[in-house]
């Protein structure tokens, strides 16, 4: 049974039936509830909703963009991912003065959205200035600026100073390998000192992982599923000898991930968030040789935009299909250490069956 789509449909219905009308920064208007949760066991399938078709490649591209520590939309555009176009364009329009827009069209300072995107792709100087979104997710995950000054060199009689930059993702992986029972296995994107420098403060602002030991029987079942030969039968009463190297590198622990989200665009954004953190959990588990266990989303302001209500009602009426299975290429490079060596084609969802896409406008 696909319990994930069912939970999601129940959440949409909850918002429609119990939500309060609220204004919002986009001027669109929402109906909203507060404090909800999504829980999914990864053993039941990969958490990619089936009640509407999901843009898998765009989803993977965005997560790889985060893991690269990138904050410029050029990489996204080169991979045909347009999730952040509206935010970048809004930032561009807000910073080009009206008088420049009116009198300087020939210098390409008054561009349409389409021309703006094309210019990002073709002009590296323009992309560097206008394609960057500020210190958003990738910067905080991989390059958190601690503001702690250190000497990085000398220029004659003078010291040259820099600041300590923290790679939270690499630290998380190291901590999982050295202290998997720690209660500090967290990553935050909510850098208060830099919020005003971002085109949009993080909606999903942090996540925590949690690990527990697998039982011998759980380990044997995992080993069997990965190594069985034709004719072998799984026997639950078997007690394997894991001191024997024959069973290595069967995982010894399982890992869960819980993310926190202050603002939840429930129709367009949440399905992406669920699958994206599901993929992140799979990637982290792969890095530390653990088994993905549970995915949990703690959701704050959970809303539907007023121009998404009919689309949500349509999705509620659809019957879910079975969830797909994720396959990650068996490449040697670490996804965390070398995300630039990975592409969306390295992440495949098998047996994905879904209903058609339901289009809805994006509010920026």
Predicted features along the sequence, with ranges:
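Terminal, non-catalytic protein-protein interaction segments that mediate quaternary/complex assembly
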Residues: 1-364
């Amino acid at each position: 049974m696909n319990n994930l789509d069912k939970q999601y449909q129940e959440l949409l219905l909850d918002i429609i039936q119990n939500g309060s009308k609220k204004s919002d920064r986009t001027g669109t208007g929402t109906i909203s509830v507060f404090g909800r949760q999504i829980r999914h066991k990864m053993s039941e399938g990969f958490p990619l909703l089936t009640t509407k078709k999901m843009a898998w490649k765009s989803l993977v591209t965005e997560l790889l963009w985060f893991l690269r520590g990138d904050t410029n939309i050029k990489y996204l555009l080169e991979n045909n991912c347009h999730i952040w176009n509206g935010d970048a364009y809004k930032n561009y329009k807000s910073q080009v003065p009206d008088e420049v827009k009116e009198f300087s069209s020939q210098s390409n300072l008054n561009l349409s959205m389409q021309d703006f995107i094309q210019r990002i792709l073709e002009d590296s100087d323009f992309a560097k200035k206008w394609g960057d979104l500020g210190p958003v997710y990738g910067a905080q995950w991989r390059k958190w600026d601690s503001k702690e000054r250190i000497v990085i060199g000398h220029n004659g009689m003078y010291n040259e100073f820099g600041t300590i930059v923290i790679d939270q993702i690499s630290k998380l992986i190291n901590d999982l390998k050295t202290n998997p029972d720690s209660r500090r296995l967290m990553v935050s994107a909510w850098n208060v000192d830099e919020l005003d420098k971002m085109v949009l403060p993080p909606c999903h602002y942090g996540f925590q992982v949690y690990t527990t030991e697998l039982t011998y029987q759980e380990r044997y079942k995992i080993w069997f599923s990965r190594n069985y030969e034709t004719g072998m039968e799984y026997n639950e009463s078997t007690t394997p000898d894991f001191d024997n190297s024959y069973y290595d590198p069967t995982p010894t622990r399982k890992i869960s991930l819980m993310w926190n989200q202050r603002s939840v665009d429930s129709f367009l954004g949440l399905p992406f968030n669920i699958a994206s953190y599901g993929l992140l959990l799979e990637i982290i588990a792969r890095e530390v040789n653990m088994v993905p266990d549970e995915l949990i989303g703690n959701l704050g302001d959970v809303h539907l935009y007023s121009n998404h209500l009919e689309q949500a009602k349509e999705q509620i009426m659809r019957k879910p299909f079975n969830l797909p299975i994720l396959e990650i290429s068996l490449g040697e490079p670490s996804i965390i250490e070398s995300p630039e060596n990975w592409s969306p084609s390295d992440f495949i969802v098998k047996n994905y069956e879904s209903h058609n896409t339901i289009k809805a406008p994006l509010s920026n």
